[in-house]
């Protein structure tokens, strides 16, 4: 493992020229108190969690314990302005000191944050950074996904602390903190709103759109009541290139403030796409997902986003790109990002490659009564999948406390705001199989207030309240019978055929949904499932497929890839042929 991992710019949708990556070897200690440790336990390779092999530590942070980090650093070159310290994600709660001064903190293990550390910097240099972290894992109500201190089956080892890139940048006194970019496919426009750091600061904007390096639109903005600037740019018809899996065209966008001397202005670089999601009846009156006004078969995989050496954190950017490219080459156009939020670069690569993403809200809440939430409901799914998620069930579903419900509302908003800049995200999934679920109808309303340009899968699997755009089925055990409904039908989990491939690290206890004994048997069962069970349901309204899953994960050996991503388990040619057959059948059906 390299000593300076993941050096790439971590935020492609809001880029500046100033960039100083702080990944690498830091000192660490795990103690029982929040105070600075008297001594350090050794080195940790950031941004890998201490639980991972890649970190060089291999220790689990227990609830109540403190994980401390320390390193020295040099601020980005230049003078004046402000220096910002960025964290891609820290799980779960942290406090940050620079040169002994508390500069801020953060709560929430999946979302980026930045701290202005300018006033704490040492004029003579020799700056030092301390980070103290706590992670309650399963003892809290926070989003945690599939992390557990007792991993088995479909739940995986917990990870904690810094797990995404840490970096510095120098910005002007009044800088752009975020962009809200709203493309309008029908009007062929893009509206750009910049939020700036100082109340009453410069709000006038300049923006330019380029297509293939050619400037196609530019405009000025004006002050608005809240002192944030906005511009709307029109895309000429001859440069109208809709985004789709077959043609994932991205427009380049540059935005700058215009007031003050040149060194006082801020300039950022971004991108966007023109595309439109909707639901509409096909030629036979059956509801379908539509991209840019045309019915589309969403054919994809469940993606947990775990890696054997780094858990949540990939070994390098190239490994991420290779995996996504291979998925696309196999004929898939969809990934359901399951119970995890990825680093921004992952979505950037999906934007560029044309892979559609259905994004889960990361599940949290109190302990789940799995005997009820998962096992009983699954066995009796035909009877229970539409069970109301009303207050009497909140205790069983892990949302009995007001604090847990408030935490979910904050997490939902943070997720949408963090990812809505990515064209690849086509659907929000507020809840999965009842884990931490409550008031799904209210969650759909909250999502649509934040973003009304995407689909919403209200409740993936069961505890379906009848809202959102998707009738979302999970089916591993029953005969598949689909019928047309008022919402579009998606088979959002199925398959999961297990096969521990020889020559790869064996699981402690193999987990999956049926087991093959060889590559040939796995391939044959995959083909039979897709062509004899799934394909006939397309004409009855089935419009999205999410096979479980991309790769093996810990004890789960039901992936198409091995855990280390070095091999595809079924015959790749057969997978491509099956996906081509599904696509051809769908196109014929919706004609």
Feature map (PLM): residue ranges:
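Accessory carbohydrate-binding/adhesion or oligomerization-edge regions at the termini
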Residues: 1-54, 132, 136-141, 212-214, ...
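Accessory beta-strand-rich segments of carbohydrate-active enzymes
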Residues: 8-13, 27-32, 59-175, 199, ...
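Beta-strand-rich binding/interaction modules
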Residues: 96-98, 189-222
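Signal that preferentially marks extracellular ectodomain short beta-strand elements
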Residues: 115-120, 232-248
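Short, aromatic- and glycine-rich surface loops/edge beta-strands on solvent-exposed regions
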Residues: 128-131, 247-259
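Surface beta-strand/loop "capping" patches
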Residues: 170-200, 283-288, 582-590
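N-terminal carbohydrate-binding accessory modules
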Residues: 179-180, 254-327, 581, 586-588
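Substrate-binding/catalytic cleft of secreted carbohydrate-active enzymes
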Residues: 334-579, 585-590
């Amino acid at each position: 493992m390299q000593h300076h991992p993941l050096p790439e710019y971590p935020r492609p949708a809001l880029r500046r020229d100033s960039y100083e990556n702080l990944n690498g070897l830091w000192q660490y200690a795990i103690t029982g108190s929040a105070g600075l440790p008297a001594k350090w336990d050794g080195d940790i390779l950031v941004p890998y969690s201490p639980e991972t092999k890649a970190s060089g530590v291999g220790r689990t942070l227990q609830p109540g314990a403190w994980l401390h980090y320390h390193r020295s650093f040099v601020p980005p070159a230049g003078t004046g302005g402000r220096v910002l310290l960025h964290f891609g994600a820290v799980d779960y709660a942290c406090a940050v000191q620079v040169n002994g001064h508390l500069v801020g903190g953060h709560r929430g293990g999946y979302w980026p944050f930045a701290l202005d550390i300018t006033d704490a910097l040492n004029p003579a240099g020799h700056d030092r950074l301390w980070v103290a972290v706590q992670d309650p894992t399963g003892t809290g109500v926070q989003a945690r996904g599939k992390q557990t201190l007792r991993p088995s089956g479909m739940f995986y080892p917990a990870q904690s602390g810094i797990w995404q890139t840490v970096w510095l940048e120098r910005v002007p006194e009044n800088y752009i903190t975020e962009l809200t970019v709203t493309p309008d496919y029908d009007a062929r426009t893009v509206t750009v709103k910049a939020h700036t750091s100082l109340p009453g600061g410069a709000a006038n904007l300049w923006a330019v759109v380029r297509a293939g390096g050619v400037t196609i639109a530019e405009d000025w903005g004006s002050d608005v009541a809240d002192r944030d600037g906005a511009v709307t740019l029109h895309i000429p018809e001859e440069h109208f290139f809709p985004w789709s899996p077959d043609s994932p065209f991205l427009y380049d966008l540059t935005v700058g403030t215009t007031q003050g001397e040149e060194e006082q202005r801020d300039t950022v670089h971004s991108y966007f796409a023109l595309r439109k999601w909707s639901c509409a009846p096909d030629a036979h009156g059956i509801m379908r997902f539509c991209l840019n006004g045309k019915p589309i078969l969403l054919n994809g995989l469940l993606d947990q986003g775990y890696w054997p050496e780094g858990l949540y954190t990939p070994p390098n950017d190239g490994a991420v790109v290779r995996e996504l490219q291979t998925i696309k080459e196999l004929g898939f156009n969809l990934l359901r990002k399951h119970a995890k939020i990825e680093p921004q670069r992952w979505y950037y690569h999906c934007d560029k490659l044309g892979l559609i993403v259905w994004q889960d809200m990361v599940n949290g809440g109190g302990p789940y009564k799995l005997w009820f939430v998962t096992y009983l409901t699954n066995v009796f799914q035909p009877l229970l999948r539409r069970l109301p998620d009303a207050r009497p069930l909140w205790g069983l579903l892990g949302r009995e406390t007001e604090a847990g419900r408030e935490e979910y509302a904050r997490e939902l908003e943070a997720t949408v705001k963090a990812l809505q800049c990515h064209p690849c995200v086509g659907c929000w999934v507020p809840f999965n199989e009842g884990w931490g679920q409550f008031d799904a109808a209210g969650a759909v309303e909250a999502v649509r207030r934040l973003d009304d340009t995407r689909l919403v899968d209200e409740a993936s699997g069961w505890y379906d309240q009848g809202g959102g755009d998707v009738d979302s089925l999970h089916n591993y055990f029953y005969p598949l019978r689909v019928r047309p409904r008022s919402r579009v039908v998606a088979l959002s989990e199925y398959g999961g055929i297990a096969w521990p491939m020889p020559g790869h690290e064996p699981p402690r206890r193999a987990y999956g949904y049926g087991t093959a004994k060889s590559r040939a048997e796995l391939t044959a069962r995959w083909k039979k499932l897709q062509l004899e069970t799934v394909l006939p349901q397309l004409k009855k309204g089935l419009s999205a497929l999410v096979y479980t899953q991309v790769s093996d994960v810990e004890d789960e050996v039901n992936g198409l890839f091995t855990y280390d991503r070095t091999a595809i388990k079924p015959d790749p040619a057969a997978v491509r042929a099956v996906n081509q057959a599904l696509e051809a059948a769908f196109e014929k059906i919706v004609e």
